[in-house]
A protein has these predicted regions:
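Conserved beta-strand scaffold positions in the cores of enzyme catalytic domains, especially
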Residues: 93, 129-130, 182-185
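Beta1-alpha1 glycine-rich phosphate/pyrophosphate-binding loop at the start
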Residues: 3-12, 44-126, 228-239, 258
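Rossmann-like dinucleotide-binding core of oxidoreductases
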Residues: 34-36, 47-49, 54, 58-74, ...
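Phosphate-coordination loops involved in phosphoryl transfer and adenosine-cofactor binding
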Residues: 39-41, 132, 196-198
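Residue-level detector of flexible, active-site-proximal loop/helix-junction positions
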Residues: 100, 136, 142, 189-192, ...
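Extreme N-terminal leader/targeting segments of oxidoreductases
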Residues: 1-41, 167-188
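Feature captures the FAD/FMN-dependent oxidoreductase FAD-binding
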Residues: 105-167
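Conserved beta-strand positions that form and line the central face of beta-propeller blades
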Residues: 77, 95, 137, 147, ...
Length: 277
């Protein structure tokens, strides 16, 4: 049975990689030539996934793109996560550009950053990027052109805002925190941390919370407990299940909402229960 599962996984990954090659060949826009005429000037705020893909697409269509990023490098939220972090959903639903090629269904942080760097280099996005630049003000002049941070000497024909919803790591204040004898860490600070023999409490049951508990157990924690406001669906990483679950946000427009949660629990919680027990 194990050999059959391994064979099926290998076939699935092969077909997935073949699909990515086809997408790359058919849909990747060509990088512009150095002497290509410019269509106009566009400012892109943010150098995360959306900012990077937007800038690459704009440059491929001949626009003169300037990227503003408050961090010291591109990458967005993936610059702040642990080296053990990886996608919680299938990467087939996380393709931010046709050029991207994932070698696994659930790539890790370094793989995702490498794909971002490939797109970045291919479209020469480093030619006009302003790192360590926080955009605090955006205006339009009388001619309808965009002004960034009050610099009226530099204007843009278009503006793309890609700041996203994820910000910098935020530590919440806790009552009696100073008198607590243990260590208090943010979920983004787990690299190379020693959990051997410790009892760990994770506040929050989202993706990073589950990942933190898993990391603690893998590194020898005696026990890991997740505190969450409500139940969450924590299921094994399976491509078909991922695709099915993505239908839920659309509610009654699909029949997925009819599936009882108890059935999901019975079928997919068991692996987590076994691991946490």
């Amino acid at each position: 049975m194990t050999c059959v599962c391994a064979l099926l996984d290998a076939i699935r990954i092969y077909l997935y990689q073949l699909l990515q090659v086809l997408i790359n060949v058919l849909f990747t826009p060509l990088p512009p030539s150095a002497d290509a005429p410019k269509m106009g000037r566009v400012a892109v705020i943010g150098a995360g996934l959306t900012g990077l893909s937007s800038a690459a697409q704009l440059k491929s269509h001949g626009f003169d793109v300037t990227i503003f990023e408050e961090r010291a490098r591109e990458g967005g939220i993936w610059c702040d996560v642990n080296s053990t972090s990886n996608l919680q959903t299938s990467s087939i639903m996380y393709r931010f550009h046709p050029l991207v090629f994932y070698r696994s269904i659930y790539p890790c942080r370094d793989d995702i950053l490498a794909q971002q760097r490939k797109v970045w280099n291919t479209y020469r996005l480093d030619e006009n990027v302003r790192f360590n630049t926080r955009v605090t003000k955006v205006d339009r002049n009388k001619a309808g052109r965009w002004i960034i941070n009050g610099n009226a000497s530099e204007t843009f024909d278009g503006l793309v805002v890609t700041v996203g919803t994820c910000g910098k790591p935020n530590m919440i204040p806790l009552p009696n925190q100073k008198s607590f004898r243990g260590e208090i860490l943010h979920s983004s600070q787990l690299d190379e941390h020693d959990f051997e023999g410790k009892r760990v409490v994770v506040i929050g049951g989202g993706a990073s919370g589950v990942e933190a508990a898993e990391t603690a157990l893998e590194r020898g924690a005696k026990k890991a407990t997740i505190l969450a406001r409500k139940d969450h669906w924590i299921i094994p990483r399976q491509l078909l299940v991922d695709c099915f679950i993505t239908l839920f946000p659309y509610g009654s427009r699909f029949l997925a909402w009819l599936v009882p949660e108890q059935l999901i629990r019975r079928l997919h919680y068991r692996e987590l229960d076994e691991k946490m027990s």
